[in-house]
Every structure is written in structure tokens, then in C-alpha cells.
């Protein structure tokens, strides 16, 4: 589980529901199922013999559906997904128990109420499977790809990676020039592969020369040295990863690379939170692992 998801808009907007086919379909079916169960329960109670337990199920599921609707419209699903799964799991017990109390009755209103509770149970199972899975899960990635507010660079605020990842040692102080980072500097969360365009070795090694680009300079116009080209060519990329979100590189960090959602990248090492990757056009650099999924 990620510890932080970055800042996201907390405003309530029905457009997030309308723009998300999965949320729109499941919430609509859930509301319809609740109405069927509610109306049928009233008619069943008039006939007599309706189990009182089923009324509590209706009240509980009303707040569950309302809670899911509010979290989706507020773009707070990843913040409250654990609570959502917990309440829905309890609701599933209530709805299935109500079905068991009603489905065997020959009275038509009882059967209609049972049908409503069955629909509520089915929607609850779907929600538990969706919200109980990580955002990187294949089925969630597929479902979220159709949501308008979760697509493209504009949805950066809804991605499951904390903005704190960019606060690595090399970017905390703008006066420090870019360099090849050692495992001690990175505390073990970077890959040990050398970054493209930078000579290897610890900070201050003799292999470093003035051809390395500097912040704010015109380093992009300089030609890499022969040693750097050999070093870059020696890196192997045995893994392939697919981008599940678009990522815009930090302009203050020349090591990072930008990529678009669904891009296929070659990866040299998958042991840290930042992976050494190569784009199809040959550009190399580091990419956040939470934006990628191995193929």
C-alpha cells in the first residue's frame, strides 16, 4: 500500500461519476437495486411476516451506496478504499442473510424484495473486488483507463504516487550539480545502474568531467564522451514495463525521463522505487516504479 497519494482535488463533482463508466454503471445499478428492495419490502410488510432484520440491511446499504457515491465524486477513493471495503464486506453479510430469509417465500412481494437484495449483493461483490485491489492491478488499470478524470497528464493529481518521491537528495538543494549517485546517497531505493549521460563512480571520482550537463546550463548541446557512450551501451535492459500513468519529468532533475500512459519501456533493474529505463526512441533515465507495471 502506498503511504501517500499526493494532493488531489477534494471538491464534490458529479462529473467524476459521469466521466467514469464503471462508477456510473455500478452506482446506478446499486441505486436501482436498493429502490426495488425498498418498495418490495414495504409491500411485503403490508402482507405481514416480513423479517425486521431486512430493514436494517436497507438502512446500512443506503449509507454504503451514498458513501461510494461521495468518495467517487470527491476523487477520494484511494484515501478511503480500506474503509469502503470494510463497510461493503459487512453489507454483503446483511444482504445475503436477507436473501436467505426472503427468497424461499411463495409470496410475490417477498420474491421481488429478494431480487433487490440479490442485485445489491452482486454490486457489493464487484465493489469489494475493485476497491480491495491495488491501483496497479490489471483489472483496475483496465477499468480506470475508461475514466475521463483518470486519463492523460491532467490526471496527475489522481495517481497513486506521492509527490515526495521527487524530493530526493539531488533535488533538495538547487545549488548542487547533478551527479552519479551512490547506493549510500540513495539509501538503497535507486537502482545501481549508471544514469545515461553521467560517468559512473562515486561523487568526486576522476571519471567525472566537464561534459556532464549542469542545472540551468546548455549541457544538452554537448556531445557525450567516448567513455560515457561505452558505459551507456554496456547497460542491459532485460525487463519490459508498461506505463499505467503518464509522467512528466522534474525539470530540475536531468536524470528523470518523461513518458506517456501505455508507453512500453525497457528496464535494467527492478529492485528499487526508481528504475533505470530506456524509451523506444533510445532516451534513458530513471522512472518511478509506481507508474510502471512489468510485462
Curated annotation (Swiss-Prot):
Domain SH3: start-end pairs: 236-295
Topological region Extracellular: 44-52, 103-111
Transmembrane segments: 23-43, 53-73, 82-102, 112-132
Function (record text): Plasma membrane osmosensor that activates the high osmolarity glycerol (HOG) MAPK signaling pathway in response to high osmolarity.
Chief place where the protein resides: membrane
Membrane topology summary: Multi-pass membrane protein
Protein's UniProt keywords contain Zinc: no
Cystine pairs: none
Residues of the signal peptide: none
Chain spans, region Disordered: 150-176, 191-233
Species, as recorded: Pyrenophora tritici-repentis (strain Pt-1C-BFP) (Wheat tan spot fungus)
Keywords carried by this UniProt record: Cell membrane, Membrane, SH3 domain, Stress response, Transmembrane, Transmembrane helix
Topological domain spans for side Cytoplasmic: 1-22, 74-81, 133-295
The keyword Transmembrane appears for this protein: yes
Protein name: High osmolarity signaling protein sho1
Annotated InterPro entries: SH3-like_dom_sf, SH3_domain, Sho1_SH3
Amino acid at each position: 500500500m502506498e503511504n501517500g497519494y499526493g494532493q488531489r482535488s477534494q471538491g464534490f463533482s458529479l462529473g467524476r461519476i459521469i466521466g467514469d463508466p464503471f462508477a456510473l454503471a455500478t452506482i446506478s445499478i446499486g441505486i436501482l437495486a436498493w429502490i426495488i428492495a425498498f418498495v418490495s419490502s414495504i409491500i411485503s410488510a403490508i402482507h405481514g411476516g416480513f423479517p425486521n432484520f431486512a430493514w436494517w440491511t436497507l438502512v446500512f446499504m443506503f449509507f454504503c451506496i451514498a458513501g461510494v457515491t461521495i468518495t467517487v465524486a470527491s476523487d477520494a477513493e484511494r484515501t478511503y478504499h480500506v474503509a469502503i471495503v470494510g463497510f461493503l464486506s459487512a453489507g454483503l453479510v446483511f444482504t445475503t442473510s436477507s436473501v436467505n430469509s426472503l427468497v424461499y417465500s411463495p409470496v410475490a412481494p417477498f420474491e421481488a424484495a429478494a431480487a433487490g437484495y440479490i442485485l445489491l449483493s452482486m454490486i457489493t461483490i464487484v465493489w469489494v473486488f475493485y476497491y480491495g485491489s491495488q491501483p496497479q492491478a490489471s483489472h483496475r488499470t483496465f477499468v480506470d483507463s475508461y475514466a475521463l478524470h483518470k486519463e492523460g497528464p491532467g490526471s496527475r493529481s489522481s495517481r497513486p504516487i506521492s509527490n515526495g518521491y521527487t524530493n530526493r537528495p539531488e533535488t533538495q538543494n538547487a545549488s548542487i550539480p547533478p551527479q552519479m549517485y551512490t547506493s549510500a546517497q540513495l539509501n538503497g531505493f535507486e537502482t545501481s545502474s549508471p544514469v545515461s549521460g553521467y560517468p559512473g563512480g562515486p561523487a568526486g571520482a576522476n571519471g567525472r568531467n566537464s561534459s556532464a550537463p549542469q542545472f540551468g546550463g546548455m549541457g544538452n548541446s554537448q556531445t557525450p564522451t567516448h567513455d560515457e557512450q561505452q558505459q551507456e551501451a554496456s547497460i542491459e535492459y532485460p525487463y519490459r514495463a508498461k506505463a499505467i500513468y503518464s509522467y512528466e519529468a522534474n525539470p530540475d532533475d536531468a536524470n528523470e525521463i518523461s513518458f506517456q500512459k501505455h508507453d512500453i519501456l525497457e528496464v535494467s533493474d527492478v529492485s528499487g522505487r526508481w528504475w533505470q529505463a530506456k524509451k523506444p526512441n533510445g532516451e534513458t533515465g530513471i522512472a518511478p516504479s509506481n507508474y510502471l507495471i512489468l510485462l
